[in-house]
């Protein structure tokens, strides 16, 4: 009958529309995932050019000061750093042990540059070494500590990397005990911290965050 055919036609149209909506939602989800992956890759590789620039400046200084052995050591550490950091997928997380090892390589490079000023303390228990974190997530924080804490100081400055697991949440702290920074030079407004914040947000959303403060006696804690 007419009404029977109309009912079937309406049902067919409704099912077709629902199918198209689901297909559109799946396409939107794929596009959103692709955009997030592209964003994560972009943020990951923002770190590297800045690091290369600083290292080449350091190498140039060593060569000009006729310190070839130290320059060779820095080149070897840089080579190891890049061979390790660039072999993995930027979207993959890495064990905290690997991330700490990368920062030890980076700090070894900077120790050649600041032999009398840079002191290093790493306090990361074995119990959290297997926890996974985004690759190179600590690099901007350690670079900031070098740039604002060590490079501007006239005395020894200690950079500390610590990690603890509290209530199933991994807390990582990078700090330095450098001098009090002028009020017009806010470490918390730099590209490095914004990079870490954006990467954490893109990777974990509200499940992760970054915080920082300036101790009264000076230095910086992230």
Where are these regions (language model features)?
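Two-component histidine phosphotransfer core
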Residues: 1-216, 220-221
């Amino acid at each position: 009958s007419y009404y029977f055919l109309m009912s079937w036609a309406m049902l067919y149209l409704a099912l077709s529309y629902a199918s198209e909506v689901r297909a559109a939602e799946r396409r939107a989800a794929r596009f959103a995932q692709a955009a997030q992956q592209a964003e994560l890759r972009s943020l990951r590789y923002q770190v590297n050019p800045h690091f290369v620039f600083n290292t080449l400046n350091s190498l140039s200084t060593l060569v000009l000061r006729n310190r070839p052995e130290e320059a060779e050591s820095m080149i070897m550490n840089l080579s190891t750093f890049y061979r390790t950091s660039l072999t993995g997928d930027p979207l993959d997380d890495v064990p905290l042990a690997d991330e700490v090892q990368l920062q030890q390589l980076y700090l070894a490079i900077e120790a050649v540059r600041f032999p009398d000023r840079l002191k290093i303390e790493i306090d990361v228990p074995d119990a959290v070494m297997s926890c996974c974190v985004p690759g190179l997530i600590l690099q901007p924080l350690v670079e900031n500590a070098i740039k604002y804490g060590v490079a501007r100081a006239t005395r020894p400055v200690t950079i500390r990397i610590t990690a603890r697991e509290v209530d199933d949440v991994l807390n990582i702290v990078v700090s330095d005990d450098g001098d009090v920074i002028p009020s017009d030079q806010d470490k918390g407004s730099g590209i490095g911290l914004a990079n870490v914040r954006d990467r954490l947000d893109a990777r974990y959303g509200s499940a992760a965050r970054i915080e920082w403060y300036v101790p009264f006696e000076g230095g910086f804690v992230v």
